[in-house]
Amino acid sequence: MKIFAHLSWLYATTIIFISLTLVILTYWLLPRPYARKISAWFVRLSIFFSTDIQGVEDPAAQMYLINHQSDLDIGIMETISKKDLSWVAKKELFDVPFFGLVMSMPEDIPIERQSKTSLLKLLKNSKDRLNKGRVITMFPEGTRSRNFKMLPFKNGAKVVADKYQLKVQPIVLMQTAKYYDIKRFYYKPGRIKVIFMDSFIADKSDEKWLSNLRIKMQKVYDDELSNNLSHR
């Protein structure tokens, strides 16, 4: 059984790399965001995962905050949202050959965790993308979480949302690492639950709204885990 899961992971990973090549080859031929959307759908259809959506995507949302467990997470969001998403990711990923090109071409936003000027650059780049009608999309944990518990949220999301008084929509992805886990070389097809929570306007007078949001998202995750046998 493990051998089959490893072979499935190899197949899925190959498909993902092909999809990244597809982004590069089609980016200048298609209006944004279609190169990335087509690439994401190519992955979704080729590796046979589907989604079960709860709640409604807010058409007026300007920022998405999403929990992060798997490399599938970006592809999931790109297939369920028609919006032009601008992903915020650590700068080191932009420096990786090939993969960095896939992120820099669509004008995703790099962030340097140790840089004193990083937040200023983040604010400037975010404003530029918002002016282009794009949605700032972040994994506020900063990296993949494990063991069903979300990591503390980084403050960058709050800085941007507060500065521009953005309408924020939290989104909970359920157990995506159960289906694709690069550390275990594991993949299995499945139906992934996506929960759109209620959106809100960022209130900079509330210093704890981001940490409180993590608690709310964790509760949504825990409740879904407890009430839905398919997650076990």
Short names for language-model regions:
Residues 120-232:
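Non-catalytic C-terminal accessory region of glycerolipid acyltransferases
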Residues 53, 109-112, 202:
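Short acidic-hydrophobic, aromatic-tinged amphipathic segments that line or gate anion-handling sites
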Residues 53, 64, 87-88, 194-196:
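Generic preference for hydrophobic
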Residues 1-52, 101-102:
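A transmembrane-helix-recognition feature enriched in membrane-embedded lipid enzymes
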Residues 17-29, 58-116:
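Catalytic core of membrane glycerolipid acyltransferases/transacylases, capturing the structured
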